Amino acid sequence: MKAQPKASHFIGGAFVEDKTGKPSPVIYPATGEEIARLYSATPDVIEAAYAAALKAQGEWAALKPVERGRILRRTADILREKNKKLSKLETLDTGKALQETLVADAASAADALEFFGGIISGFNGEFVELGGSFAYTRREALGICVGIGAWNYPIQIAAWKSAPALAMGNAFIFKPSENTPLSALALAEAYKEAGLPDGLFNVVQGFGDVGAALVNHRLTAKVSLTGSVPTGKRIMAQAGEHLKHVTMELGGKSPIIVFDDADIESAIGGAMLGNFYSTGQVCSNGTRVFVHKNLRERFVERLVERTRKIRIGDPLDEATQMGPLVNRAQRDKVLSYIEKGKAEGATLACGGGVPKLQGFDKGYFIEPTIFTDVTDDMTIAREEIFGPVMSVLEFSDEDEVIARANDTEFGLAAGVFTADIARGHRVIGQIKAGTCWINAYNLTPVEVPFGGYKQSGIGRENGIAALAHYSQIKTVYVEMGKVDSPY
């Protein structure tokens, strides 16, 4: 099975190859086989990307916003037309089940392009009356923006970052994760087909050194990263040396709080979505599931029953509900956390091992795992695992669970399940997290901002807020009378 692209990079509207760069094999996580081989960007490739972006950006920013938006909306249409093909590519790249990629990856990318393409013409500055004279503000492009992607939602992340940047009149250079480099190239082709001028969306492949080169480049005006907290800290420090704009969408250890009046099936469904979707490789996952003591026994019994029915197997089979983790290193990391959970006294209620799957013995599969009797100080309740490992914790009252939910360095997301809507609002109002749900979990419509508090990030993806993060404000004062000067 092969998925070799035409070349490693996409620059100035064309595929570009330079095999003097470091080789980067692309592995299909379900089988461990190499499906493509790309090459890391050399300094010449990086400079070519900046030259193309610089040449194109000024003319693009000068277009009417509605004209820029029209191209983004055409790109959205192209992604939807090619959704099946793109979803299969994303499954090969990430190992995620096709059942998921058909609805959550290229589809979400299309939603972002459609949203920002439609809203940009109404994103304007302010007018302030000053007693005859007046002032107004203009929202202007930053210039060349850089996006650095993660491996869990490659095409979605590429679009979530590039759509508002391009809508605002910027040029964009995107570096996908070296683990999942393929679908960003497909997005570049879709932009080209839709009529995006050459040089405005460029893709360069590579490892951390390429990311650092982009962050530190003199022409980079802004950096947007989706990744881990340690990576975010490094990139923010580098960007800070040059006072570059940054958006950071980082990790989490988010709480889901289930009160005893909650609809138990909905709460369990939300907890499963918040732990097992994308094989647990979702930054906003609610991996600390706090269940009221009156509901805990029934909740766990039914949760385990439903979890054991999850179908693990061939990701390209649409009946499969869970695929493998992205690579062997990630599986080894998750398995080590499972061992820590057992060693620290948590009860393994379900899963915890590597399933035996005919024809996929070299894949990076792992069973959906549930721990009970988890305490707040255990490693599995403190650190981001990024795999299908759920910790169930018991609580007895509202104030207690709010304090425990907030006792973390992270603040990306949170969820509350309750029949008392007033309590839902009251609790969410006290949770220190940037993206919250009441009686739902992990739904991320592009119309609203997504991002975190504390060490989970800075800035926001999506919603009108994202446009603000890809623009700068110019204030213009207009004097309608004579200048009053004491000199």
Curated annotation (Swiss-Prot):
Pathway: Amine and polyamine biosynthesis; betaine biosynthesis via choline pathway; betaine from betaine aldehyde: step 1/1. It is an enzyme of class 1 (oxidoreductase). InterPro entries: Ald_DH/histidinol_DH, Ald_DH_C, Ald_DH_CS_CYS, Ald_DH_CS_GLU, Ald_DH_N, Aldehyde_DH_dom, BADH. It catalyses: betaine aldehyde + NAD(+) + H2O = glycine betaine + NADH + 2 H(+). NAD(+) binds at G149, A150, W151, K175, P176, S177, E178, S228, V229, P230, T231, G251, C283, E384. GO terms for molecular function: betaine-aldehyde dehydrogenase (NAD+) activity; metal ion binding. The keyword NAD applies. Belongs to the aldehyde dehydrogenase family. PANTHER family: ALDEHYDE DEHYDROGENASE-RELATED. Dimer of dimers. This is Betaine aldehyde dehydrogenase.
